[in-house]
Amino acid sequence: MQVILLDKVANLGSLGDQVNVKAGYARNFLVPKGKAVPATKKNVEYFEARRAELEAKLADVLAAANARAEKINALETVTIASKAGDEGKLFGSIGTRDIADAVTAAGVDVAKSEVRLPNGVLRTTGEHEVNFQVHSEVFAKVIINVVAE
């Protein structure tokens, strides 16, 4: 099925690309999420008329994401207190929700879906580097300092 992409889609293309995808992927994911429209003659003409507007909208979203990433990077370190044993092992773990709540409390709104933990949840005290994917192209880094209560 031919579709016109209205947004950047990973491993598929960017705004304005006409790509061939499986019908189920287009019907169940791309079209309902507003990431693509079927490539009919009417939609192609409509898209070409609105292309500049859509590109400007995408640029605004990217600029807003860059601004949020700068705010997150400006935090540098965030401290989270948790119960821990003698050797520095935590009772339980610190996951994406705990990190998102701590960063939000520090003054920058972050959703738990934006937190990236490449090594899994945090299970020890000390400093851990955590990445945030604010946008498909924009990343930020914060050092999380886990201390024992």
Curated annotation (Swiss-Prot):
GO biological process, one term: translation
Keyword tags: Ribonucleoprotein, Ribosomal protein, RNA-binding, rRNA-binding
SUPFAM superfamilies, alphabetized: L9 N-domain-like, Ribosomal protein L9 C-domain
Residue pairs linked by disulfide bridges in the UniProt entry: none
Superkingdom of source: Bacteria
Keyword Ribonucleoprotein (UniProt): yes
A Pfam short name: Ribosomal_L9_N
Statement: the UniProt record of this protein carries the keyword Kinase: no
Gene3D superfamilies in the record: Ribosomal protein L9, C-terminal domain, Ribosomal protein L9, N-terminal domain
GO CC term, one of those recorded: ribosome
One GO molecular-function entry: structural constituent of ribosome
InterPro entries, per the entry: Ribosomal_bL9, Ribosomal_bL9/RNase_H1_N, Ribosomal_bL9_bac/chp, Ribosomal_bL9_C, Ribosomal_bL9_C_sf, Ribosomal_bL9_N, Ribosomal_bL9_N_sf
HAMAP family xref list: Ribosomal_bL9
Role, per record: Binds to the 23S rRNA.
Family: Belongs to the bacterial ribosomal protein bL9 family.
Protein name: Large ribosomal subunit protein bL9
